């Protein structure tokens, strides 16, 4: 599969109106025949473990992930390195509620003598969570949060996603909807960390 290079979509302050706020950069990559991929990068003024917990723990995610209405841990636990979850998202009319079943993994390592954490999320099927008639099952081929500690209180974040919300939404509209995902995600995560 041939892919094109990442193209910058936007560069904005992570915290609008705050002097010297880190930049939040959003990029996109077209993959022929597939939904566009989006990536965001920034620096967060929090330790790597604190950010990892906010990204992984279902109760924390309910407080910052946009439009999330359910986050059910099916099996495993984030601190065990692998877990399965069911998530649903309430969207604005006329778009139906979307739901997903995910496998998530957490890997910690050292990279150039600094802590590194990678959280990978992808869609799976699970017999206890079949598709529901009142929801549209989305597909998440890939979502990766890569965290690299710059210091005890600063972490570089790179988040990449390719998601198909499913249903009858045309591909170009799906790409338009997802265009702002990375910036919203980085800002929401930072806002949660700032207030918790």
Predicted feature descriptions by range:
Residues 1-196:
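Eukaryotic helix-grip
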């Amino acid at each position: 599969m041939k892919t094109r290079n990442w193209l910058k979509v936007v560069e904005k302050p992570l915290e609008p109106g705050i002097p010297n706020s880190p930049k939040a950069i959003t990029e996109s990559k077209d993959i022929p025949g597939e939904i566009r991929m989006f990536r965001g990068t920034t620096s967060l003024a929090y330790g790597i473990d604190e950010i990892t917990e906010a990204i992984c723990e279902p109760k924390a995610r309910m407080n910052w992930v946009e439009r999330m209405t359910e986050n059910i841990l099916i099996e495993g636990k984030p601190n065990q390195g692998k877990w399965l979850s069911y998530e649903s998202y309430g969207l604005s009319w006329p778009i139906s509620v979307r739901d997903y079943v995910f496998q998530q993994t957490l890997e910690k390592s050292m990279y150039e003598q600094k802590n590194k954490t990678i959280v990978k999320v992808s869609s799976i099927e699970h017999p206890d969570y079949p598709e529901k008639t009142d929801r549209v099952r989305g597909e998440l081929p890939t979502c990766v949060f890569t965290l690299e500690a710059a210091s005890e209180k600063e972490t570089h974040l790179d988040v990449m996603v390719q998601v198909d919300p499913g249903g009858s939404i045309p591909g170009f509209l799906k790409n338009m909807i997802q265009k702002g995902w990375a910036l919203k995600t980085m800002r929401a995560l930072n806002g949660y960390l700032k207030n918790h």
